[in-house]
Amino acid sequence: MNTTFEKTRLGICLVLAMSFVTAGSVASSDRTLLLADDPAKGGSTHHATRRDAMITALASANPNPSMGDEAQTFDRLVGTWDAEFTFQRDDGTVSQKKGELLFGWTMDGHAIQDLWIGYPTEPQKERSIGTTIRFFDTTLKQWRVVFINPQFNYVVSAQGGREGDRIVLRGVDTDGLPIRWIFSEMKPDSFHWQGEKSHDGGKTWKLEEDHHMKRRL
């Protein structure tokens, strides 16, 4: 793996880790601290170092060697993806927006994190942002996943893994109904993501989210 790609992976991890610290935005007082590497601007090097330390410690350039071949389940998604998001509501209406999706390793390579960013559309003024942490449970022999979106007070968990040429994760939504997330058509420069929900205990599934990703980095 060349040096340029390694630096790209690490940079992505730092961006993902920063989502925990900033939650997508930084107050004006904090912005001053983040720029504090220049004392001439009235900053303090102590503050900048304190904030950067957590980000640096959390990010990992590669999966932990202890994960073995299981790391390849999600390692192929590491990078930055341009996203075309499609949402299908219960009333039959469909909404679309553009955004991006970033993947990178964290926690000494024992977990992989992603960051979902939806660009704002009128009349919205703020981007939507959510993040997922995944790790392979060596007892269950499955990937365990937690997704959070603070803007909507939304937290949901799922678990699963590779099923043929797809990745399928199953869980329960906040309304108590079964959900499944499917990664498919996975190629080096593109993949397809679908979010489905069942209203009959898993007998049939309704498509709620249908997203297409193309690799940027």
Where are these regions (language model features)?
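Hydrophobic membrane-insertion alpha-helices, especially the h-region
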Residues: 17-19
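Short beta-strand edge segments in extracellular beta-sheet folds
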Residues: 212-214
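Central antiparallel beta-sheet cores of small beta-barrel/beta-sandwich binding domains
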Residues: 57-59, 64-66, 71, 82-182
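Conserved Ser/Thr-centered positions that define the repeating blades of beta-propeller domains
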Residues: 196-199
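Amphipathic/hydrophobic helical signal segments and adjacent flexible N-terminal regions
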Residues: 2-14, 24-94, 217
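Residue-level recognition of beta-strand termini and adjacent short loop/turns
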Residues: 107, 187-189, 217
